[in-house]
Design a protein with these regions (language model features):
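Q-loop/switch helix immediately C-terminal to the Walker
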Residues: 7, 12-26
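Short coil-to-helix "N-cap" segments within the ABC nucleotide-binding domain's helical subdomain
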Residues: 26-46, 63, 93-94, 144-149
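C-terminal boundary and immediately downstream tail of ABC-type ATPase nucleotide-binding domains
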Residues: 43-49, 149-177
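Hydrophobic anchor residue at the start of the ABC signature
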Residues: 67, 71
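Helical segment within the ABC ATPase nucleotide-binding domain
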Residues: 96-109
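H-loop/switch region of ABC-family ATPase nucleotide-binding domains
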Residues: 117-118
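Conserved catalytic segment of ABC-fold P-loop ATPases
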Residues: 125-132
Length: 181
């Protein structure tokens, strides 16, 4: 599991290539085949629409570029699940769109994502399923049928207008909310 959030998990003082390959557990191959890994990074970057030089220092990267390098590192290390934590709090709208493009690219290749956000507009058209949480508990899980905001509006209407706590869902402790098989 990899977490991408405002606090970067990349190592300052190292290059993009060092962070993606050396620190993702393929250091022997990186030392032996530096040139081929630079080509591999360029292929990944082209697939998701970014251009970050392999030899660039991590501390020189923008927040968006750091997110993209962390995503590339997750892919290269074989991570099956990426948790994105309140990305819209620190990325601009155009960068979020570019990140969503990369998420779709990796999701189509088998990587799973949990996207935590307070902005339901941000989730429209990206998520297959939305979970509404209250005080740390999942109270409702909704499949996204139309892929638009009407799915989320319908889900949220169930919980608006009440001054008391939202109702507990039928999900009990121990029931499966997410299956990664």
């Amino acid at each position: 599991i990899v977490v991408i959030e405002q606090k970067s998990h990349l190592v300052n003082g190292l290059t993009v290539g060092d962070n993606v390959f050396v620190l993702s557990g393929v250091e022997r191959r990186w030392l032996l085949h530096t040139q081929s890994f630079r080509g591999r990074l360029q292929e990944l970057e082209q697939a998701v629409g970014v251009d970050i030089p392999c030899n660039r220092q991590v501390e020189e990267l923008s927040l968006f570029e750091r997110c993209m390098v962390e995503l590339l590192k997750a892919w290269e290390s074989g991570a099956r699940l990426v948790l994105l934590w309140n990305i819209s709090h620190f990325l601009a709208g155009t960068d979020i769109g570019r990140l969503h493009y990369a998420i779709r690219h990796f999701a189509s290749r088998g990587m799973a994502f949990i996207y935590i956000s307070n902005s339901y507009e941000e989730l429209c058209g990206l998520c297959d399923r939305i979970a509404v949480m209250y005080n740390g508990s999942v109270i409702k899980v909704q499949e996204m049928v139309s892929g638009g905001s009407e799915d989320i509006h319908a889900l949220l209407q169930q919980f608006t207008g009440t001054t008391s706590s939202p109702p507990r869902s039928a999900m009990s402790r121990g029931s499966i909310c997410l299956n990664l098989s």
